[in-house]
C-alpha cells in the first residue's frame, strides 16, 4: 500500500501539537506502508515534500484558493509515487480531495475543528475525528471515532529525574508542578499563577516547558505578585527534548480553559484529545486536567488522573495538594495511567487504526 499524507500547513519537524500529530502519524504509517508526506514549505526529512506555506487568510474561501494553487506542484510530486490512498488533515483545505480525484484514490479526511473544505468532506470515503460531533451532521455517517496518544518510547518512565531537576535548578525537596505545551489563552495558564499565589510555600515550584503569545503577560503578572522566583521557563524546545525536561516534575497539569477555545465554547465542553495528558501519563507522572466529556470517555477520575471543573482554581489546587499529601497513592494512580496509555493510546496504535481503515477503503473501492 502507498499512502499519501497531505498536511501542507504543518511544519515537520516542529514544536507544536500539529507538528507532533503529523510527525508521529507519518512515522507510524511508515512502519506499515510506503508513505509520502506533503508538508509545509519549511519542512524537511526523508519522504517529506516541503510544499505549502502558512495560510494567513481568515476567510475559508481564500484559504481554499491558496490550497488549490498548490495542486500543480503537489500533483507533480505525487505522480511518480502513485498513491493507493490519501489522508488529508482538514486544514489543507481540499488539496487532498483534488489529489484524490486526480489519482482516483480513496480519501480519508481528518476533522479537527472548523478549518476544513466541504470538498474534502464530500469527497472523503471516510472521516475521522476525536469527537464525532466535530463532523458536520450532513456527512457524519461517514465518521469514525479515533484517539491520539503518546510516543511511549520517547516519553519514557525511566528518564533521569535527578539530573533533570539539577539542570533546572530545583532542590531535592522542591515539589515541582510541570506544564508542557503552547502558551495560548485557551491553555489556561493563568490558573497556575493563581495556584502559586494561593499556595505560598516557596518549595512548591513550577516548571513551564514551552512558549507562546501569553508568556509575556504571565511573566508580568508573576513579577507584580512577587512569584517569579518560583517559576522556571524553558522556552520553546524541540519535541525530542521535552521529555528530558518534563521528567523533573512531580505532578503535571493541563489547565485548559474551554471558554477561550471556540470549538469547545460552541459545544459547551472541551473537544480535543489533549496530547500533553497522554505524554504526562506515558512518563508515569501524576496528572491533573479539566473535567470534559471526551476525557471521561478515556480516563477515570481518581484511577488514572485527577479531574477538576474547568476554571475552578480552588478545585485545581485541591487536586494538586492531594498529590502532594498522598505521594504513594498518586504514584499508583500514575502507574495505572501509564498502563492505560501503553495499552490503548500510543501514536502507533492510532496509525494502526488508520491503516485498517485504509484496507477497508481499498477493499470497497
Role assignments for model-derived ranges:
Residues 217-246, 251, 261:
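Nucleotide-activated donor-binding/catalytic signature segment of Leloir-type glycosyltransferases, i.e.
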Residues 133, 148-149:
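Carbohydrate-associated surface elements
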Amino acid at each position: 500500500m502507498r499512502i499519501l499524507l497531505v498536511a501542507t500547513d504543518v511544519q515537520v519537524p516542529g514544536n507544536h501539537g500539529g507538528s507532533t500529530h503529523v510527525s508521529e502519524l507519518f512515522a507510524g504509517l511508515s512502519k506499515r506502508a510506503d508513505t509520502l508526506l506533503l508538508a509545509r514549505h519549511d519542512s524537511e526529512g526523508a519522504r517529506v515534500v516541503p510544499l505549502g506555506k502558512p495560510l494567513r487568510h481568515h476567510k475559508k474561501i481564500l484559504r481554499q484558493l491558496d490550497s488549490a494553487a498548490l495542486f500543480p506542484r503537489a500533483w507533480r510530486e505525487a505522480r511518480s509515487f502513485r498513491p493507493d490512498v490519501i489522508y488529508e488533515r482538514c486544514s489543507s483545505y481540499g488539496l487532498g480531495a483534488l489529489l484524490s480525484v486526480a489519482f482516483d484514490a480513496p480519501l480519508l479526511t481528518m476533522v479537527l475543528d472548523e478549518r476544513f473544505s466541504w470538498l474534502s468532506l464530500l469527497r472523503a470515503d471516510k472521516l475521522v475525528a476525536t469527537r464525532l460531533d466535530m463532523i458536520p451532521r450532513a456527512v457524519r455517517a461517514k465518521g469514525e471515532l479515533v484517539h491520539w496518544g503518546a510516543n511511549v518510547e520517547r516519553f519514557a518512565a525511566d528518564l533521569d529525574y535527578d539530573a533533570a531537576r539539577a539542570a533546572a535548578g530545583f532542590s531535592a525537596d522542591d515539589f515541582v508542578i510541570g506544564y508542557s505545551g503552547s502558551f495560548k489563552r485557551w491553555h489556561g495558564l493563568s490558573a497556575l499563577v493563581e495556584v502559586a499565589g494561593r499556595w505560598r510555600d516557596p518549595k512548591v515550584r513550577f516548571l513551564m516547558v514551552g512558549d507562546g503569545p501569553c508568556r509575556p503577560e504571565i511573566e508580568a503578572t508573576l513579577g507584580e505578585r512577587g512569584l517569579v522566583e518560583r517559576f522556571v521557563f524553558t522556552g520553546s524546545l524541540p519535541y525530542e527534548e521535552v521529555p528530558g525536561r518534563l521528567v523533573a516534575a512531580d505532578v503535571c497539569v493541563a489547565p485548559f480553559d474551554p471558554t477561550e477555545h471556540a470549538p469547545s465554547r460552541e459545544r459547551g465542553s472541551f473537544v480535543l484529545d489533549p496530547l500533553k495528558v497522554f505524554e504526562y501519563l506515558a512518563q508515569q507522572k501524576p496528572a491533573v486536567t479539566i473535567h470534559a466529556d471526551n476525557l471521561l470517555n478515556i480516563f477515570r477520575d481518581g484511577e488514572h488522573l485527577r479531574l477538576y471543573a474547568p476554571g475552578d482554581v480552588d478545585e485545581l489546587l485541591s487536586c494538586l495538594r492531594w498529590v502532594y499529601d498522598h505521594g504513594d497513592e498518586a504514584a499508583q494512580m500514575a502507574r495505572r495511567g501509564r498502563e492505560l496509555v501503553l495499552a490503548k493510546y500510543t501514536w502507533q496504535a492510532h496509525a494502526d487504526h488508520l491503516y485498517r481503515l485504509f484496507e477497508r477503503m481499498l477493499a470497497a473501492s
